[in-house]
């Protein structure tokens, strides 16, 4: 009976308090699949070709979070480069675009430092850089060339939840909405074009995390 009591007390200690805490001063990293789903639109020539479309893409997502207090966190979202196909209803796929959207968030975690489940919300800023953008053969056949996109700054919002498995490990899910507005610069028949493009994606991530 004494051994059982000792074991029960040890288990209670393990399952309570800081055993599951997101605590002030703590740092943790999450990793998992992150999917970018644009809610796209375009102006100019691209906008008049009907059905402007940017494909979804999934890459490895990483988040790095520092807890300033038991409830306030600061998070950086990073990922391997996303690759999107761009097209219109009139032309089909015409180009491939690569981008990186690092996003810095200020977060509020609900509950307290003894909670195993920590829902959270966040607001912050997104910076998106575009690179290795090119028209495919289909785009080139229509007289398109020299594609580039202007880097973008915009606001971002987030909701998510962490489930704390033990003192070191957690699993989580998070959704971001990002304001990504850019300008597509290209030539059509040798004439320079500048079209406004709105990506404004939803980003979904399921992750496993480790706390340091």
Swiss-Prot record:
It is found in: Cell outer membrane. Keywords: Cell outer membrane, Membrane, Signal, Transmembrane, Transmembrane beta strand. InterPro entries: OMP/PagP_b-brl (IPR011250), OMPW (IPR005618). The keyword Manganese does not apply. Pfam families: OmpW. The keyword Transmembrane applies. Residues 1-21 form the signal peptide. One of its GO terms (cellular component) is cell outer membrane. One of its GO terms (biological process) is transmembrane transport. PANTHER family: OUTER MEMBRANE PROTEIN W (PTHR36920:SF1), PTHR36920. Belongs to the OmpW/AlkL family. This is Outer membrane protein W. It comes from Salmonella typhi. The lineage of its organism: Bacteria, Pseudomonadati, Pseudomonadota, Gammaproteobacteria, Enterobacterales.
């Amino acid at each position: 009976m004494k051994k059982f009591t000792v074991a029960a007390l040890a288990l209670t200690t393990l399952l309570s308090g800081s055993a599951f805490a997101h605590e002030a001063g703590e740092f943790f990293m999450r990793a998992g699949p992150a999917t970018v789903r644009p809610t796209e639109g375009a102006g100019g020539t691209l906008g008049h070709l009907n059905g402007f479309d940017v494909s979804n893409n999934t890459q490895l997502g990483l988040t790095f979070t520092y807890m300033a207090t038991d409830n306030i966190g600061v998070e950086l979202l990073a990922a391997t480069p996303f690759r999107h196909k761009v097209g219109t209803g009139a032309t089909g796929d015409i180009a491939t675009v690569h981008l990186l959207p690092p996003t810095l968030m200020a977060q509020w975690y609900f509950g307290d430092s003894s909670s195993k489940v920590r829902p959270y919300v966040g607001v912050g800023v997104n910076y998106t850089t575009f690179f290795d953008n090119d028209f495919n053969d289909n785009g080139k056949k229509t007289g398109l060339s020299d594609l580039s996109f202007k880097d973008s700054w915009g606001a971002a919002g987030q909701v998510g939840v962490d489930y704390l498995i033990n003192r070191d490990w957690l699993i989580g899910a998070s959704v971001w909405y990002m304001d990504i507005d850019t300008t597509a610069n290209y030539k059509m028949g040798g004439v320079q074009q500048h079209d406004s493009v709105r990506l404004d994606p939803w980003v979904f991530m399921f992750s496993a995390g480790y706390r340091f």
